[in-house]
């Protein structure tokens, strides 16, 4: 990629199936660069294409990226996940999947007097291990990218100091200095109040701020990270998405953290293990509660000391993604029997044989997708719903996208069902949160999409998770 204010040397390679020449049937009349997105980049020709007696030639140009160059990004945007639709940033591209890339090379021929133009986006070439040479369209990105590890989370009410780490990346080919600071809610302070960075070309650095919330209540707060360099402010970062064979594109995120003050109690001495499945950010969310789980490897499942953990969480669809999990199911059940807590997040049908007592999803897996539905608490005084936080129907308010999937259809009498919810026209679903005492420990199955709610800082999801991992305390 390139950044505003930089130069790029572009080689345009032109070839044809036959020779061209002045006055011949096939003539190459000109080669040039253009900006399909409507920008104007100053271009200097360094080496002209040959128009005589050949069927292949190169033209070389220097393209200067203006300071106000349009960044390569989607022409549509959505300010937050609460908004159900996208807004059009640039109506010129409304009938296209993406806005055009910023620079293209063109050649014009005449064949028997008929003009023919051919063009291609300008591409950069690099090598990837295992793939080899890969060509990607040239893109324009900001000089500095500002990123946060997460964009939403909780701050337990009563917290006096809370860390927030900001990563600043220099995407230019020159060393840059930058000053980083946070825009905080009124009355909040941080230390340091700013951070000075010396960034190498392509380099990145972290700054961790100790944030001191004042008057923290059960509401949303917004914190923005800003990096200043060369008299300009930068307050967003981007991810490059795509893979070999699919043109990459660039998705931007504002460097904004949405913090939610939450009344939550979490035992301070919990030790938690996590078995990652197909991928989620639950371990990071647990960190916001002061719990820093250990990611368990296949070797840990086979021979590790599981008894050191107060609770072990099984990630979403882990029984499908981790063969070692099913192979060592008895070790996990032994861990529960000896006093541990095993929390199984939503799975597919294959996990049923790994439970201590019979349970199943049934022939048709039940999902509950209307997050506006009401969740009924069936056993409000059950310890799992009272310790250390009292869970009520209000903890299921404000959920995003869905309540959950893979609700159980059948379960043994050893299990207790704690909640009920259903979509309109659907039979009541009580298989979303069930648990059983097994030996000295507790086995829990939860199909509620906690992993999705934790990402969005939904207070009730954190409070419920705190109760689940505390079940053995």
Regions from the language model: what does each represent?
Residues 2-16, 155-165:
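Contiguous beta-strand segments within globular domains
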Residues 14-21, 168-172:
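Asparagine-centered strand-capping/turn motif at beta-strand->loop junctions
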Residues 35-51, 184-194:
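Short beta-strand and strand-turn-strand segments in soluble, beta-rich domains
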Residues 49-57, 196-205:
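Short proline/glycine- and polar residue-rich coil/turn motifs
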Residues 57-101, 205-216, 221:
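Short, hydrophobic beta-strand segments
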Residues 102-105, 111-117, 121, 134-167, ...:
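Extracellular ligand-binding/catalytic regions of CAZymes and related secreted enzymes
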Residues 233-315, 346-348, 368, 452, ...:
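Aromatic-Pro/Gly-enriched surface loop or interdomain linker
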Residues 317-397, 446:
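A glycine-rich, often tryptophan-bearing local segment used as a flexible ligand/cofactor-contacting loop or short
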């Amino acid at each position: 990629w390139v950044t505003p204010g930089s130069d790029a040397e572009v080689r345009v390679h032109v070839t044809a199936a036959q020779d061209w020449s002045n006055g011949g049937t096939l003539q190459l009349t000109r080669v040039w660069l253009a900006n399909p997105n409507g920008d104007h980049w100053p271009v200097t020709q360094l080496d002209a294409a040959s128009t005589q007696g050949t069927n292949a030639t190169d033209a070389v140009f220097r393209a200067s990226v203006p300071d106000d160059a349009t960044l390569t990004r989607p022409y549509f945007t959505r300010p937050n996940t609460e908004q159900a639709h996208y807004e059009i940033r640039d109506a010129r591209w409304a009938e296209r999947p993406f806005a055009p890339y910023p620079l293209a090379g063109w050649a014009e021929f005449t064949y028997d007097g008929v003009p023919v133009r051919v063009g291609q986006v300008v591409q950069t070439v690099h090598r990837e291990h295992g793939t080899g040479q890969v060509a990607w369209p040239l893109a324009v990105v900001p000089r500095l990218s500002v990123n946060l590890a997460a964009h939403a989370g909780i701050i337990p009410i009563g917290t006096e100091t809370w860390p927030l780490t900001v990563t600043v990346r220099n995407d230019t080919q020159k060393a840059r200095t930058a000053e980083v600071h946070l825009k905080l809610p009124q009355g909040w302070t941080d230390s340091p109040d700013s951070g000075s960075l010396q960034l190498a070309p392509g380099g990145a650095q972290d700054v961790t701020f100790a944030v001191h919330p004042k008057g923290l209540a059960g509401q949303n707060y917004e914190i923005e990270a800003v990096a200043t360099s060369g008299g300009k402010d930068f307050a967003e970062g981007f991810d490059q998405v795509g893979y070999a064979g699919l043109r990459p594109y660039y998705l931007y995120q504002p460097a904004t953290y949405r913090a939610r003050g939450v009344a939550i109690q979490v035992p301070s001495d919990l030790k938690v293990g996590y078995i990652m499945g197909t991928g989620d950010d639950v371990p990071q969310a647990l960190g916001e509660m002061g719990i820093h789980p250990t990611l368990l490897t296949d070797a840990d499942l086979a021979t590790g000391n599981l008894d050191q953990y107060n609770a072990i969480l099984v990630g979403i669809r882990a029984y499908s993604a981790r063969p070692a999990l099913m192979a060592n199911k008895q070790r996990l059940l032994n861990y529960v029997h000896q006093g541990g807590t095993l929390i199984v997040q939503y799975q597919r049908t294959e996990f049923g044989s790994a439970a201590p007592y019979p349970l199943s999803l049934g022939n048709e897996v039940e999902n509950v997708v209307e997050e506006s539905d009401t969740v009924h608490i069936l056993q409000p005084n059950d310890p799992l719903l009272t310790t250390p936080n009292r869970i009520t129907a209000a903890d299921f308010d404000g959920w995003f996208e869905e309540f959950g999937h893979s609700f159980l259809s059948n379960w043994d009498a050893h299990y207790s069902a704690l909640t009920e919810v259903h979509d309109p026209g659907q039979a009541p679903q009580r298989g979303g949160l069930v648990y059983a005492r097994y030996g000295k420990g507790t086995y829990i199955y939860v199909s509620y999409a906690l992993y999705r709610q934790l990402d969005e800082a939904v207070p009730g999801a954190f409070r419920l998770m705190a109760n689940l991992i505390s079940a053995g305390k």
